Amino acid sequence: MMMSSVAGQRKGPSDKSAAVSEQLIAQITAAVEAGNKNLLRKLGMGSYGILYGAQEKKAMELFDPEDVHNITSLWSSFKKTFTSSRDHGNLFFHLYGVMFFMVPHVHGGEGSVKISLCSSNDPTNPVLQEKVLYFSGGAQAVLMSPTITLPFVKRGPMFYYTMECLGTRAQIPCSVVAIWKQKIDIRSAIYSKQETMSWAIEALHRPQFFQDRQEAAQYISSVYSNATSSATDSVLPFVGAQLGDTKMNVPSEARMIRSSSLRVPMLKVQSKRFSSMEIPSTSTAHLLGTTRDETVIQEESRYEEEGDDGVLFPVKKAQGLNYSHVWDNLGIESFVDVELPENWDELSVRQQVAAAMIAFANKGVCLVPKHIINRDKHNIHLENITEHNYLVILERYGIVNAGSLARTENWYNLTLAQRVEELIYQRDDAYFMFGDNTNPYPPFDCYDGLTLKVRSELERVAKEQARQRFYKEAARAQVKNKVAQTSVEEIPSTSFATKVAMESGSVDSMKIAIQAEAANEAVRPNEVMFEFGQEMNNEGATELELQQPACVASNSFFNVGVFEFAWKKSSSVAAEVLSLALPAALFGKSKEMSMGSQMLRYYDAALIMYKVILYISGMGAISGQLALVWDECNVLNRKKEFINIASLYASKHRLVSASEQSSGEFCFTPTGIGKFVPLDPASGAYDLGSIRVFVTHPLASATELESIPCHIHLQCKVLSTNIMQPPRLRAQAQFGMKPDQTHFPRFPTNQVLLHYNWGVAASMGTTLVSIFSPSGIYESDGTLQPSLLGNIARNCKWWTGTCVFEICIEKTQFHSGSLAIGLGTLNTSMSTPHDILNMPHVICNLEMGRKFYFRCTITNWNGKNLLTTGRKSSLPRPKHMSHMRLFATVLKPLVSTSIHLDTVGVTVQLKCIEDLVLGGTVSVKPIYGHWTKGKNAVDFLFSEMDLSQRKEIEKLRKENVETFDEKGKKQPQVQVPLRDKFSYGAVQYFVMNWKDEERLLVLPCAPWSVRFPQGALVQEAITCPFIDWCSSFCYWSGSLEYTIIVHRVQTSNNIGGVLNITLDSSGYPFPLGISKGTYVVSAGGGAKWAFTYGMSDNIFSFVVHDDEFFPRRHTKARAIDPNASRIMTLQDRLGNLIINLPAKDVISSLEILVKPGPDFKLQLAQAPSANHEKHLGDMQTHTYLYTPDFSELRSFEN
């Protein structure tokens, strides 16, 4: 798919053939990958063959014939799209080489094995290369390469190899492991021996064999080279039957600089059934997070993940030949007058660096690398390294292959930040001293003192400035009139259009400025879509420090409990003998529960590492086996009758024999679906899974013992806790807004959470609780007031940010007392007044002042918070699971020295949200905009029409709601500009059931909507978010993009027609709605669009540009007076859209969608339009007195 540079929308392929080609290419790629995986699954690790003495010659194919047939069939279909020649564009099978490892199993050493690399292209002479390996020589390795390619066609020739044992009577003389590199390409080639040797060294350069290329070269040198050779590690290939007799041009082992990590190559095998045989993981996450007391049980999937083009061991990218950064780092500008070794050109970069430093040292010059001198100034010391971002930091700093870097001796004693720094140091040494570009140096200066966060922000600003310059240049090119080119900045500052100020000479703070265009320095100009205007309240406030309870972690494992069970002799295979749910096992009612488990009750969420040890209390002549299984998500509990040995061994498990009596430590750290695990049983994410014990071999004994006692010792280690646990909700349906996320530097909310009178009669501990949501609704005496964020972000799903709360207490100098304001969740309970100190809180002492504010960054256990508003029928009740709670508790009762001043006013506001990030997408919420006297009995999803047309609406929605790719998840969300997030189409009008004699539709060209009478042929969509946007701002400006969806009558014999749309911006007051007329509308030279509709193309889009007749227009529809001036009818709209509707037997209905244009802007935020309870149904209050029954505060004075 390609992107349009004009509108930023996705466009499909240019024609159907291109789409078919793309689909075939994807199928071919999938078939090749499937063939490689099938081969690996069939052959195991490479090709592992056990040879039997009495067995005849054994042959192994290098590609499965069924996969060959599948790939070639798809390729033949693809070739038909661009050629008719059968032999044009064939595929070729490239075999870079096959490496064989032979391990003898005979003691005397007699006998040999003959290995042959063959091709079926010449049946009479199939052997390409052949080698006889004698068992007396021990374990040996040999490399063979065909140097040619073969056509990859159906029933065509193929590479294979044969193995045959000679001169031995042993039953199993030896075993052979073969690994190879292959590729399927449309080009043919002949490979040189040097390329084959390069692949051989890279194949050996793996954690299972060697750590670096030098080790691989040393191993080859020790086996195949003579003692007098003096070449580099750029060795030539040792291909051919005379491999052992040929003198290889490789460096002598005695003359090479030996690698410090050289070891005997060893192959380790791991499977789920034998978890004790582990291959140490070298992935970045495991390399940084492994501790000595962890037991990791994981499946080795390296062969499937790292493969490229069917390569079992992928070749690394060739390093560049320009190593100027190495010599610049040493400060070497010239090698003049420096005596260098004679074989300088044959040395590796590592050897050249060592030789250069020795040569300069002989001259009395000590070279100290710059990266060593400036190590303390490295930017990595400025980064805030946590367990959530260390992978991103390593990737941005160039660590793409941590497996090529070695662990230090004190690795397990280092913290996470120190491990990251150590990897950076090792990369710098490899890059600057050895010329190794495996982990490339980042493209920025690592010593400029800028962190990654600051650097990203600067890059974003630079890109935005460049884009702004581009837009300005494009705008100048389109303007032909020089007068129109005059910008706002060129108007003199004394002009009334620029600024009108009323100043008072005594008080500077009373200045009132009215500006035509308000500026927000924190937001980039092009991204300004919601311009809130300046705030008038500049009164100072005292900042209160939020007293957040510390997030705790345990230093070591603590005991949770001992859980006993009996292993009976009658228990059959795969029978379950114990089940222990987590984390519910931590909160049992047993008296033996430890203090550590009890302390977790004070926290809402935590990240816990579990350690499980299974003990079998049996001695003597007994046998049997148990399986200790961690069943995440309780998979084994769904169909207990189908559990068998295969399902148990496929799970994460540990086998315990009756003779062992102990399972050892079984450690795991489940996280569920979030970053933390909620400890609230009401959460669906609370149930992580269960520890289960199954019988794999029944209990047997030499005595009449019927059962033996067993017990599980459960220990925990709290890695971190999370205090705030905002609410949870099920995801809602998708419609309209994009799921990407966007950022507001500061979003003014001014949302009232509490407003009441605090009286002297309120005793200590009196608590008010407010249902709190940044997008919620304030209710007072039946009046409902939506919040600004609720109106603007009604289609967003989640938010993160720092909330700034303001507390205003209208008190005098005669009052004293203290009030605590705390933030809690549904899991928060208070039994004493001081329980509020166990949650994030602030304490307002009346002696400190009258106005206070505090900040709190609210983070849910999954890292994001839901945006929630009330439904149209009612506000959520106190037990609703979708809101946080704000508590106001009296710590010190109010004291007044005057009997007439027995109360003080208290107001708690959510002033703004800083660094607000909005993301996700949900279906539309109920509106609180221009509409009043709405329908009480109809749900908001179907309140656009009367009940008789509900089925039609459901049909329209099913046909037009956006669908998602079912093949897999989309790419992870990235932060998009504000305009990209909020520029989406929403249904504004429905038109259906018109008559043939009434086919002239007139609609206002504006973001606000007109409400037509009930039963009219045109109905507005009251769930259009632009209604709420317009009710929250005073003015709008810019262009609008319209989309018209035509619903064609499927039974019509008419194949299509032309849809005419005209923009009338003359100002004449046309009556809105459907009028009589069937003629083709003429634009008279004005803007007009004509779209052809038919069998396939039934969706049309067009843009109505702002003529800038007014700098901005009203967001509220103005009353039209036929006798008034035409200029009055254009103050709220760009004009009227006149649409000539098709005949009703061709088109059944129309959907008209509106979308903000690239320069659309809303200006000067206002209080969102409120509504009354009697028009929207019975409502519940959002403020309650904190009692067990949550008594309503209807009678509380406001």
UniProtKB/Swiss-Prot annotation:
Pfam families: 3A. SUPFAM superfamilies: Positive stranded ssRNA viruses (SSF88633). It comes from Tomato torrado virus (isolate Solanum lycopersicum/Spain/PRIToTV0301/-) (ToTV). This is RNA2 polyprotein. GO terms for cellular component: host cell plasmodesma; viral capsid. GO terms for biological process: transport of virus in host, cell to cell. Gene3D superfamilies: 2.60.120.20. Specific enzymatic cleavages in vivo by the P1 encoded 3C-like protease yield mature proteins. The keyword Magnesium does not apply. Capsid proteins VP35, VP26, and VP23 form a capsid enclosing the viral positive strand RNA genome. Together they form an icosahedral capsid pseudo T=3 with a diameter of approximately 30 nm (Potential). It comes from the Viruses. The keyword Iron does not apply. InterPro entries: MPV, Viral_coat.
